[in-house]
From Swiss-Prot:
This is Transcription elongation factor GreA 2. Necessary for efficient RNA polymerase transcription elongation past template-encoded arresting sites. The arresting sites in DNA have the property of trapping a certain fraction of elongating RNA polymerases that pass through, resulting in locked ternary complexes. Cleavage of the nascent transcript by cleavage factors such as GreA or GreB allows the resumption of elongation from the new 3'terminus. GreA releases sequences of 2 to 3 nucleotides. The gene is greA2. One of its GO terms (molecular function) is DNA binding. It comes from Lactiplantibacillus plantarum (strain ATCC BAA-793 / NCIMB 8826 / WCFS1) (Lactobacillus plantarum). Belongs to the GreA/GreB family.
Amino acid sequence: MAEDKTYPMTEEGKVKLEKELEDLRINQRPEIINRIKIARSYGDLSENSEYESAKNEQSLLENRIKTVEHMLQYAEIIDSDKIDETEVSVGKIVTFKELPDEEPESYTIVGAAEADPMVGKISNDSPIAKGLIGHHVDEEVAINIPAGTMTVKILKVENA
């Protein structure tokens, strides 16, 4: 992981990551350690699928812990209240419509750590967010997406 990369996120996103880290350390880690102990008690580890499974889960868990710790260490909290209220940025809800005549869509732009497209939270690293960030209400913006280029008009920007 690059040491100089920051992870833009809202305060809410940071709190969510802190809670996840606490759960990983306090609940999940001891549970997996206990499963490893139980699997060891079965004897021969060379053919012990429970042991192998628990060790694999432990490896995934420890990697997730390291990732979350790194993201929190290099978190850049975005205070959307300090950004022009008409400018699209992390922590803002943006409503736009694809031109010429599509229905309006609204998304909250968040850091990658808190993105959840199923609930309308898109990562600042996504093509749509990258194309919108820095633009203002009433602007028409050409956005490069994997399927080509889409032109949108920004209708509204508000704090999340």
